[in-house]
């Protein structure tokens, strides 16, 4: 069934006619009303970032409808490419359910800190999975990430004592950067980091150079570990 006023079944709402009691409504050439869901996002992007942006993120559930519609209306209005790179992330789950405000199962950073974890442990936890791969959160999994990060920090301190300067080029650095450039393959990049730091085939200077590169991309305080 095609809604009255549509020219095509795939048409989506750009402007909604106001209903009695609507808290948000404005005058427009099409009558008093409020913008459609997709228009809200296009308007915010244009107002704050401009008509063309490099990276747009969002959940995987927004890819097929919302972001396609957002692109269609933005490019029609502005006459230029809307987004150069889309990053659609898979869901974070907990006990088999998607983490969401509507379900009331959200974990806040303050909760993480109250349980004694360093905030960067949560970042490390996220980096262990590719952004397009579902990730299951538990306090046990976060504890494992925290232990791994603490081991990385210890390795960093040990290497800092041995290293005299940074090596600007190495095969290890190239492997790490290749993983990052491959659709942000952070699990593989972390794997290369661990492999290099544990190996005896690389000089301390090469390891320190890789730690600096990893820190620039991950922000894990690898070269300035907390004491």
PLM ranges: what are they?
Residues 98-100, 105-227:
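Structural preference for alpha-helix termini/caps and helix-kink/transition segments
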């Amino acid at each position: 069934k095609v809604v009255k006023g549509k020219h095509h079944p795939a048409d989506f709402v750009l402007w909604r006619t106001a209903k009695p009691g609507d808290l948000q409504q404005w005058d427009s050439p099409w009558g008093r009303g409020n913008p459609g869901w997709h228009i809200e996002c296009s308007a915010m992007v244009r107002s704050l970032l401009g008509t063309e942006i490099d990276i747009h993120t969002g959940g995987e559930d927004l890819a097929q409808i919302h972001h396609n519609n957002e692109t269609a209306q933005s490019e029609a209005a502005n006459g230029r490419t809307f987004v150069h790179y889309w990053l659609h992330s898979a869901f974070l789950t907990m006990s088999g359910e998607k983490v969401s405000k509507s379900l009331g199962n959200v974990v806040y950073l303050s909760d993480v800190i109250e349980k004694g974890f360093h905030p960067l442990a949560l970042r490390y936890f996220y980096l262990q999975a590719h952004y397009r791969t579902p990730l299951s959160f538990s306090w046990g999994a976060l504890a494992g990430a925290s232990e791994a990060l603490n081991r990385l920090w210890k390795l960093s301190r040990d290497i800092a004592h041995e290293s005299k300067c940074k090596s600007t080029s190495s095969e290890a650095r190239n492997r790490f950067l290749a993983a990052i450039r491959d659709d942000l393959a952070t699990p593989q990049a972390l794997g290369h980091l661990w492999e290099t730091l544990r190996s005896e085939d690389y000089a301390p200077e090469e390891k320190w150079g890789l730690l600096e590169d990893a820190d620039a991309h991950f922000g894990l305080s690898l070269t300035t570990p907390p004491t």
